[in-house]
């Protein structure tokens, strides 16, 4: 798409020239005095920070802190931004983060089907699970099995910034980031209780309580306890989550919010890791049951203890300059033991004649993670000539330490079509990873959002990061790297609510990986060009976003996990369309279309893969969900909702010879509200379609979840 790149660069260059026109006009009459500074009262599109962090009314967001770190109207961000608020999460019946994002453009959620201990997310074709998720603006980085699992019950909203975010957040997923915004004190009395149970017999009880403690102190506590069976055989769980928060606000200029969370999770695994032959296509024995789980029930275990505590401090001076400090400490210990299938007996892709047995891997790990992050910001607004500057300066520090042990052991084979459990398993072998790894990262950044000429918006970002990584034990290595990232965006706000924009952004993503020759992997790098339009209609409450983008990632890892090379380049370019609307008070709609062209552009170790699509990833997605509430009459308070999700076909192999079919799924919601009580029934995969969600190679396929009904009852007072 070279013409697109040239046009975008030309537009950006013309935007820079336009920014100087008012100043040149002034210079013709008298000298421009740059040292004369005028403080502005508003440069964020009429938004406050609470709007960028707080609840979303219905389905339509207005502001975000994710696309610029300061709270700003979404229309002013020169990239695509989606927000899923609590109202939309509840309408969808989402009980996990990945369930809440199934209707969001550019996001591939649950690519392996059900996984109750991980929120798997891909954005614009790139995996955001480990390095593209954030909680309250601070990264939830994970490596190996050392990460943090966030429960959706404690989340107020989910912001998705599509495209590179390194210019704001440092090293991150090139396809975009997902920022979970915690529920926090509002200063209003809140008493909310919710109970639910699904068709598997998995039930929960949740609460959300908040109020004023004094004139200057507000509090909020939410939590959930949940337990029962899950979708596949032998899969069950018990989890408890509690998230207390307190806000101290002595005056309108100062606030300190303390946010904490404790999570306990005890479960048995969902299964998965199924072969392509036997799931997507049948073998001589037929197809493997979609509820089959080939672990050992007496062995399988997953235990998570997780804690985080931090604060957000903000003070605005009389000059309207604001300082902020966001800090969080996190701890997690995760222990797992399970058996996973890996092909058929002999580790074959297809079963030998008359042999229905699966090979299995006996896997165990013990992982402890400690993290600390501090993000310091200075924000202010000044005017130079005819240009209003919204300035942001920041310095961030991140510390990540993981102490991990991973080992495998002997495992018996098991019949894929008539499994028998309980055979003794072989002993565990010596660990192949026994490591203490530490990573320190320091980043400094600046942003200037310039507004001029009755509608022009020019946004410039720059950030430099340096990262030190040191690992002792097995394996051991030491490495440090630094990189600059930038973003430039130009937009124009018309009075009718239309805002076209163009942007270019560079990125880097430091990865922890040793290559086949013993060297350390370089950071993934690249650039994205994006052009789009955002439309906020004046005749109904809505937001429509359309975008074209061209994103290239270099230094992509290739080869097997035991012989990694870094010789690849992958390109993702395409189109995204999203509409979120509150049509009157009774109708709410969210709809999206995603169309990509995902291709391997370089692979020096295997040139036959050039031009192929990476496995697992579909190139088309589309969805629509509509909710209607009867406003009056005998059926007043009744809510009807429904949606359709389409996920296009993908491949199970690098050569693109084994296809995973596309699927269209229907969802249903029926609800009733009266006074302070409500009851809702959500049914996902309404017609109980049997399908494979995706395959990460021919040995690792996962069924999509069958029909699931969730009944919820809630009250507030």
What are the functions of these language-model segments?
Residues 58-82, 86, 98-138, 156:
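Extracytoplasmic beta-strand/coil segments of soluble accessory domains associated
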Residues 109, 138-162, 181-182:
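Short acidic/polar hinge/loop motifs at secondary-structure boundaries
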Residues 153-156, 167-244, 250-254, 307, ...:
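Outer-membrane beta-barrel translocator/receptor signature
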Residues 550, 567-654, 690, 712-716:
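Gram-negative outer-membrane beta-barrel transporters
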Residues 645-653, 672-717:
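C-terminal beta-signal and adjacent terminal beta-strands/loops
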């Amino acid at each position: 798409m070279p013409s697109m790149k040239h046009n975008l660069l030309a537009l950006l260059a013309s935007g820079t020239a336009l920014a100087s026109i008012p100043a040149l006009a002034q210079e013709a009459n008298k000298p421009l005095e740059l040292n004369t500074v005028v403080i502005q009262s508003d440069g964020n599109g009429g938004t406050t920070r609470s709007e960028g962090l707080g609840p979303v009314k219905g389905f339509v967001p207005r502001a975000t802190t994710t696309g610029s770190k300061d709270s700003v109207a979404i229309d002013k961000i020169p990239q695509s931004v989606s927000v899923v608020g609590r109202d939309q999460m509840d309408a969808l019946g989402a009980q996990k983060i990945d369930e809440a994002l199934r209707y969001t453009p550019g996001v591939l959620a649950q690519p392996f089907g059900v996984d109750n201990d991980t929120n798997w997310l891909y954005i614009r074709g790139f995996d955001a699970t480990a390095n593209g998720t954030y909680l309250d603006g601070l990264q939830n980085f994970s490596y190996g099995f050392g990460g943090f699992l966030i429960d959706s019950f404690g989340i107020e909203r989910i912001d998705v910034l599509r495209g590179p975010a390194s210019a704001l957040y440092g090293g991150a997923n090139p396809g975009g980031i997902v920022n979970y915004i915690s529920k926090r004190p509002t200063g209003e009395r809140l008493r909310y209780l919710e109970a639910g149970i699904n068709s598997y017999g998995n039930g929960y009880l949740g609460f959300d309580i908040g109020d004023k403690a004094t004139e200057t102190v507000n509090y909020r506590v939410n939590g959930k306890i949940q337990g029962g069976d899950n979708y596949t055989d032998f899969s069950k769980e018990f989890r408890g989550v509690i998230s207390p928060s307190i806000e101290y606000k002595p005056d309108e200029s100062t606030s300190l919010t303390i946010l904490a969370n404790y999570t306990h999770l005890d479960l048995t695994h969902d299964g998965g890791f199924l072969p392509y032959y036997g799931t997507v296509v049948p073998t001589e024995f037929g197809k493997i049951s979609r509820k089959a789980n080939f672990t050992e029930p007496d062995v399988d275990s997953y235990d998570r203890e997780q804690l985080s505590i931090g604060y957000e401090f903000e003070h605005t001076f009389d000059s309207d300059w604001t300082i902020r400090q966001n800090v969080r400490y996190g701890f997690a210990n995760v222990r797992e033991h399970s058996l996973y299938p890996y092909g058929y007996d002999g580790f074959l892709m297809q079963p030998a004649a008359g042999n229905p047995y699966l090979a299995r891997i006996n896997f165990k790990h013990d992982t402890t993670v400690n993290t600390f992050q501090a993000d310091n910001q200075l924000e202010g607004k000044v005017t130079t000539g005819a240009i209003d500057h919204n300035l942001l300066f920041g310095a961030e520090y991140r510390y990540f330490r993981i102490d991990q042990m991973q080992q495998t052991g002997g495992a018996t084979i098991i019949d894929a079509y008539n499994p028998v459990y309980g055979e003794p398993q072989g002993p565990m072998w010596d660990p192949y990873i026994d490591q203490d790894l530490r990573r320190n990262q320091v980043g400094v950044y600046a942003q200037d959002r310039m507004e001029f000429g009755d509608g022009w918006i020019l946004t410039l970002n720059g950030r430099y990061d340096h990262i030190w990584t040191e690992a002792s034990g097995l394996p051991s290595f030491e490495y440090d790297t630094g990189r600059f990232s930038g973003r430039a965006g130009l937009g124009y706000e018309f009075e009718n609510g239309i805002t076209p924009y163009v942007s270019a952004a560079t990125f880097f993503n430091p990865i922890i990986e040793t290559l086949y020759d013993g060297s350390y992997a370089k950071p993934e790098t690249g650039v994205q060009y994006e052009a789009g339009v955002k439309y906020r209609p004046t005749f109904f409450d809505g937001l429509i976003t359309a975008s074209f983008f061209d994103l290239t990632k270099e230094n992509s890892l290739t080869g097997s996990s035991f012989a990694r090379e870094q010789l690849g380049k992958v390109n993702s370019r395409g189109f995204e369309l999203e509409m979120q609307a509150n049509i009157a008070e009774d109708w709410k709609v969210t709809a999206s279309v995603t169309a990509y062209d995902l291709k391997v552009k370089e692979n020096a170790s295997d040139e036959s893969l050039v031009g192929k699509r990476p496995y697992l990833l579909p190139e088309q997605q589309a969805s629509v969900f509509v909710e209607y509430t009867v406003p009056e009459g005998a059926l007043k308070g009744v809510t009807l909702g429904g949606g359709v999700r389409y996920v296009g076909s993908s491949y199970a192999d690098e050569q693109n010879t084994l296809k995973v079919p596309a699927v269209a799924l229907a969802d249903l919601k029926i609800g009733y509200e009266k006074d302070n009580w409500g009851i809702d029934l959500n049914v996902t995969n309404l017609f109980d379609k049997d399908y494979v969600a995706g395959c990460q190679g021919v040995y690792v396929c996962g069924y999509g979840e069958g029909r699931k009904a969730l009944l919820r009852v809630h009250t507030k007072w």
